[in-house]
Structure formats: C-alpha cells, structure tokens
Swiss-Prot record:
It is found in: Virion; Host nucleus; Host early endosome; Host Golgi apparatus. Disulfide bonds join C19-C25. Belongs to the papillomaviridae L2 protein family. InterPro entries: Late_L2. The lineage of its organism: Viruses, Monodnaviria, Shotokuvirae, Cossaviricota, Papovaviricetes. A motif (Nuclear localization signal) lies at residues 1-10, 509-515. Interacts with major capsid protein L1. Interacts with E2; this interaction inhibits E2 transcriptional activity but not the DNA replication function E2. Interacts with host GADD45GIP1. Interacts with host HSPA8; this interaction is required for L2 nuclear translocation. Interacts with host importins KPNB2 and KPNB3. Forms a complex with importin alpha2-beta1 heterodimers via interaction with the importin alpha2 adapter. Interacts with host DYNLT1; this interaction is essential for virus intracellular transport during entry. One of its GO terms (cellular component) is host cell nucleus. Highly phosphorylated. Keywords: Capsid protein, Cytoplasmic inwards viral transport, Disulfide bond, DNA-binding, Host endosome, Host Golgi apparatus, Host nucleus, Host-virus interaction, Late protein, Microtubular inwards viral transport, Phosphoprotein, Viral penetration into host nucleus, Virion, Virus entry into host cell. GO terms for biological process: microtubule-dependent intracellular transport of viral material towards nucleus; symbiont entry into host cell; viral penetration into host nucleus. This is Minor capsid protein L2. Its main location: virion.
Amino acid sequence: MQASRRTKRDSIPNLYAKCQLSGNCLPDVKNKVEADTLADRLLRWLGSVIYLGGLGIGTGRGSGGSSGYNPLGAPSRVTPSGTVIRPTVPVEGLGPSEIIPVDVVNPGSSSVVPLEDLTVPEVTIDSGEVGGGGLHPSEIDVVTSSDPISDVTGTSSHPTIISGEDNAIAVLDVSPTEPPTKRIALGTRGATSTPHISVISGTTEFGQSSDLNVFVNATFSGDSIGYTEEIPLEELNTIQQFEIETPPKTSTPRETIGRALERARDLYNRRVQQIATRNPAMLGQPSRAIVFGFENPAFDADITQVFERDLEQVAAAPDADFADIVRIGRPRFSQTDTGQIRISRLGRRGTIKTRSGLQIGQAVHFYYDLSTIDTADAIELSTLGQHSGEQSIVDAMIESSFVDPFETPDPTYTEEQQLLDPLTEDFSNSHLVLTSSRRGSSFSIPTIPPGLGLRIYVDDVGSDLFVSYPETRVIPAGGLPTEPFTPLEPPFFSEFYSSDFVYRPSLYRKKRKRSDIF
C-alpha cells in the first residue's frame, strides 16, 4: 500500500495576495508577511532596550534585500544621500538706499561740537505804494533748498528684521524717513501793507517755543511718526470682588484622602454585611445589645470589645441583629450624603467554630444615623428688665373695658323712661285670625253702638283654658233699655262635640236580688 504524498502549498507571497482580498488569511502566512511573528516581536522588544543594529538579525529570506550583499573585501563607495537645499530668494544688501557724501573728519580737530544760535532770516517783499492793493499769499513763491547732509534725521522706530529659512542670516531693513515739512506763516504788522513771511522748520528742539498760535481742528487727523508704546491703563475705584469661603462644619481638621479611602474599603465592600440599627446601645455601650450582664459605668466604650462565651452558657442576644457577635470595633463617625452624622462599628460573627478553636464568621457593619436638628424659628422676643432711654406706661383703664349697666347708668334716660316701650305698634292692613282646638270654643266679641270708634282688643291666649260668660244686650229702636237683663240661674251647659257620654245613675237598670232557696 503506497502512502499518499503530501502536496506542497503555494508560496507565502501568492497566498497572501489572494487571501488578503477575502480577509481569511492563515495566521502563519499573515504574520510572516506583516513581520509579526514571535521572533519579530522579540526583536522589537529587545531593540527598545539594547542596540541590535548592524547584526542583520531578522526573519527575512536572507537574500540581502533588493540590492543584495556586498562581497567581502570589495571597495566601498559613498552613495549620495540627503536632499539638495535650494538657495533662498536673494535679499537686498544692508545699507542706505542712496549714497550721501559725508564731510571728511580731521583727526586733529576737536571732538566738541560748538553750539550755534539758529536765526530765521527775514524776507522783506516790497509791495509798492501804500495805498495800493494788498498782496495775496498765494501770489508769493517761496523756494527752499534742502541740504542732503543736514536734513538726514533718524527715526525712533524699530527696524524690520528679515530671517531666512535656515535662521542663519538676519537682514535689517532700514527705511529712511522723509525730511520734515516746512510751515510758512504770513502776517501783517500794524497798519502797514508790508507782509512778514517767516519760514520755520518742522522740527523743534525740546525746551523751545514758537510765537505762532496753535489752532486745533478736530476734522483733521494727525500722523504718528516713530515707535509708539501702548501702556494699558488701569481703572480707578473699581468694585472689588471676593469669594466667601464656606466655614468648616467641624472643629477637627479634615481627614486625608488615604484614610477616607481606607475607611470606605474597610466598611463598604461586598464581603461586609450592612445592617442599619436603631438600638440606642449602639451609641454608648454596645455590649448591652450583645450579652446580658452587669455593665461597669466607668468602662470606656471607645475601644474594641471581644466577647467569649462557653457552649454551656450560650444565650440569645438581647437584640437579634447582634446575635453571634464575638468582636465589635470602636465607633467611627462619618457624614452621609444628606448631611446626617453616621456612627459605624465593624463587628464579626462567630458562626462556625472548628475543633482547633478557630471561629469563622462574616464581617458586619452596624451603622446608626442620627436625626437632623431642625433650625429654630426666628421669634422676636421682648427685652426683660428696664433700660435707659426706654419707658413703658401701663394704664389698665385704657387697655381694659368694664361693662356694668347698673353702676354706670345712661344719664340721658330716667328710670321711668327706661320702663317705657319706645316701639310703636301699627296694625293697619292686618287680618284677625281666630284658631280653636278640637273641642268647640266660643268667642265673644262685644259690639259697640254706631257712632263710636271701633276698638278691638285681642287677648294673648296661650295654652291655658279661659272660661268666658258673655252678656247679650238687646237695644230697642227707641234707645237704651231701662232695666238690665238678668241671666238665667243656674246656667245649663251642653256639649255638642263630646267624644263620650255619661249615664245618669237613675237610668241604670236595677238588679233583682235572687234567692237560692227556691
């Protein structure tokens, strides 16, 4: 049986050229072409520490590159390398633009320059007769000649510095300024018609003054000659601004960042159980919440406490949150995000105990947040005691009012007037309504003979029973009766609307007495 022969794959450059388009190159092909093999990485890493240049160490094919290797012993020649630097733009030479002839200086002459008084010559122009017409200034031709040596003035401005590309040549560009202008003043003295022309140079030395008047016109702008220095001005009496620093909330200095990070890493991590307790023993003596027993009042609670109990005397803790606590740390004070003070204690439970006596338990973080103290309302209080400059007058009659109608009667009314009813009763346009109960009631309204005013008096009938015996008078047509009528006696009453009746004793049937003898 003949074994299958292994087919050789294509070259690495051909494989990389084909698989690069699809992006599924083999790792060895890609690393070989891109020089990312393990050897290439080691060379890069070691090359950053030690120098390996000139050794020819690499992962190439060993052909010496595109130019090949030079044979041993062959003369070496220097190959041209680098870039050719082109010359820059030619710059003008340093010096004045025009050649000015200068007087020859005698070495034996004195170096002190004598001072001379400069006087302006007066030019007199004959204007003819006195009565003739005046001479207009525009008709006068004034010609001044300039001296090329004495008219050269310096400038106070800084020259322009031009530097080349290689920063090796510095050229100063000095531009001479134009000579100052001449000013001509024309005036007339007195009543004469002879004008006076004064030619004054534009440059005036310091300390000299001219006899000319100066007119300031805001429509014309001046020319600034020379270098001007701009000095920033500061405002006077400006409003000062300051920041109010927040006062500290505690008297102790602020803890460092390292201690804060250590505390956060110690109390607030995933291996520490967080328990919020409201037991007041957490603030003073936490042992009251862990074990039952006598507490020493002189005991300092600001230390770490360790609790050891025998298995025979195991009892439940007074607080269920502090069960199986074998160690509790000292109190730590911090501040919450809401501004409250938090008291924290780090404890450890003894849940599991091995035969060797090792206790294993979870770390517990007990914290107690103190309640906030609300700000007191601002109540304006009165000052106690007497002070100079202050006086208070108290009058009980003004502050209080006493009501007693008997002691302080009204002087406008007498006793009789107070008993009278000041209200006037008016019964005009009124109706008389008579009401009665279930039983029949008789009302007697007396009649008054005609001719007299009709006056009807209605008694105020309440819940009581009133019995009335009316009298009837028959007035004959002739006048009043002479003898009064006498009512019948005794009167006889009959009730027609009675709800019951009563038999008289004489109407009852008499029963005969029967004897049992027969």
